[in-house]
Amino acid sequence: LYDSAGQKGNRNDVTGKKILGYYDVLVPDGRQQPVDIGTLWLRTFRFVQLDITTADEPLQLHELYNDFCAYPFEMKARFDADDASLEAIRHVSWRTARLCAGETYFDCPYYEQLQYIGDTRIQALISLYNSGDHRLMQQAIAQFDQSRIAAGITASRYPSNQLQLIPPFSLYWVAMVHDYYLHVPDTAFVKSMLPGIDQVLGWFERQVNEQGIVANLPWWNFMDWVPKLPRGVPKGATTAEGSAMVSLLYVYALQRAADLHQRFGNAAIATRLQQQIARIQQAVRRGMYQPARGLFADDAAKTSYSQHTNILAVLTHTATQPQALMQRVLSDTSLLQATIYFKFYLFRALKQTNLGHLYLPQLGFWRQSIRDGLTTFPETENKMRSDCHAWSASPLYDLPALVAGISPAAPGFQQVEIAPQPGTLTRIDCSMPHPAGTIVVALRKKADGNSLSGSITLPPGIGGRYVWAGKSRVLRPGLNVLE
């Protein structure tokens, strides 16, 4: 629905607005008995408008209804805290995630309905932490592997009847395989992906210039919908000088691939990947760091600075003072700002630098979207295109993984780490599905505000560790009481 100025405005307000978008033309055949007619493919909607034109005979409309169609995910997680807005965010996020999953994951159910790697990595983690169902994730990983072209990289989206190539998305696929390895006890499947991973990384290795920076990239090198980046492509990505942002994403993938090869006994390959990691990191530190600002630039000429490049510097351990860098990332408004998609990686960096207490104040976009009448979360902050986009459902992962602090401490989730970062919350009751059962975390902040009490319950046969205030405690299967 759009108003006279072409704006959507509050989605609950329909007065004076017009529907502009997809439509179907249905032509009854004139028979007297009732007949069901509908669309040839699924449609997603907030409002439906019927425009009926009759000829010599009236049209009798007996019933208008819809059938809900989605992958059968079941919500098996819980997150309750002393902030009621978080439950509303979870509710809208879950609706968003459900509508973006059918026979494959969708980036959105209204427009492309395509399984894009950048979107799918986030969707898959949401699925694991809330339903425990890894099947659509496994299928997506296999399909992306099948999409690889002869040169070595994956398609940006697959299945699709039109080939599109976004080279950075191939690096997220490598990370997605590593995610699966950490969360799902299925080493045979992960091992079968190693040849494809090597092909992707081999393609990127051939794109590294003499200085050690990824450069001269062909095709569409989208990183984020930053308004000042043409089509979301970072400075230097398609030129000879190269891009720090893409180089660090390459390191991010290399680190995960090296871990996989090391764990599967391919020590020589792991060593070679580690050498490439060191080479790229050294090149980025030498050529892209600006000491006066304490920031990594996007390009060698140091004409562009973004949150993205510095977030990736933190996530890849390229930054030597990661916590201080993250504080600058949040405070320096002159940086190109991460949009809703790349905030997923901003939040991973907050967790990694023990700044997770700053997560809850970052949820303004989600709270405002609900006030704007959205019942699903949109693609970008301007809220003018896709009103339902799966990557914006990331709080469903952030709340258990960052705030409650639940993450794998060993492959296949065979060990668990609970490292909560509750911020201003004084109470957290969280549970999530695990391959061996259910993880339950119940925490209460004590009166001093600096310590926690409560309990952590792990599935049978699953141990782990509890991390708080720089100290670690062993967790055993079953109930663990925190005094």
Predicted regions, residues:
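Accessory carbohydrate-recognition regions in carbohydrate-active enzymes
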Residues: L1, L42-F47, D51-E74, A84-C100, ...
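Alpha-helical support elements that line or immediately flank enzyme active sites
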Residues: L1, V48-T53, G118-S147, V177-V184, ...
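Extracellular/oxidizing-compartment recognition motifs
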Residues: L1-Y110, D119, R135-A140, A155-P159, ...
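Non-catalytic C-terminal accessory modules of carbohydrate-active enzymes
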Residues: A5-Q7, R263, Q275, Q282, ...
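The feature captures the catalytic groove of carbohydrate-active enzymes
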Residues: K8-Q33, G102, C108, A151-W173, ...
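Structural helix-adjacent loops and short alpha-helical linkers that scaffold large soluble proteins
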Residues: T53-H62, A84-L86, R90, L128-A142, ...
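Repeat-solenoid scaffold signature
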Residues: D332-F365, S369-D372
